[in-house]
Amino acid sequence: VHALCDAVLSACQLGDIGTFFGVDTPEMAGASGIAMIEKLRDFVTAKGFVINNVSLQIVGNQPKITPRRDEAQNVLSAALGAPVSVAATTSDQMGFTGRGEGIYVIANALVIAP
């Protein structure tokens, strides 16, 4: 969710997730990822942007993404109001992801400016 939000905000030149959901938005403390995406969607569309699509690539060994890929794509797409694709890969046992210590996500967003 963080990578998705950062990608959309960056593509719109509207800052990043820290700027948008910073300490000045205490109402978002503890909010679900879906609530964050919906608030982001409403904000960028109010600015006149159209979110065309978002691509997420998850890098890590665990958890396995494929069994729930379709579910993730459907839930994220519904919240964003635009197609979200999810791909997964490993880092061939290299680095912190290869040691199973975490994952990272690369996100790209295509938006149409007003």
Protein language model regions, located:
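RNase III-family endoribonuclease catalytic core
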Residues: 1-75
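A generic local secondary-structure boundary/capping motif
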Residues: 46-47, 94-98
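Structural preference for beta-strand elements that scaffold enzyme active sites
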Residues: 55, 83-85
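Short, active-site-adjacent cap segments at secondary-structure transitions
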Residues: 64-66, 92-95
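Beta-rich strand-turn-strand
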Residues: 78-82
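Pyridoxal 5′-phosphate
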Residues: 86-90
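C-terminal edge-of-domain segments
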Residues: 97-114
